Amino acid sequence: MSTTQLSTIEVANTLVDLCRQGRNHEAIAQLYADDIVSIEAGAGSPEMSREAHGRDAVLAKGQWWADNHDVHSSQVTGPWPHDDQFIVNHKYDVTHKPSGKRFTMEEAALYTVKDGKIAHEAFFYSM
């Protein structure tokens, strides 16, 4: 029995569709490689490391975000594919729960696909 791997554009389109529906955790569970590496633009913090290694660590990072932010709206644009990579733009209007501060943030994410799964993601945003 053989399995068919998703192409980069299929992975990209599925990720964007799921994120637009607010199903980010499902996207991670379905599309990310077991050994995914996720890199944030910032230096990290005591609560959240700059790097996450493995799907469980990426899911935990997403849970930390959800636990600490109320998302009022989100927009996802793209994908813009190139070979085994694609870029997606994410824009959020959120309130940081601990401080009560509301802000908008925009980030570009570069995803690399290997063997039909997202193997690496890197986020770019101003600090």
Placement of each model-derived feature along the sequence:
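C-terminal and inter-domain tail/linker signature
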Residues: 1-127
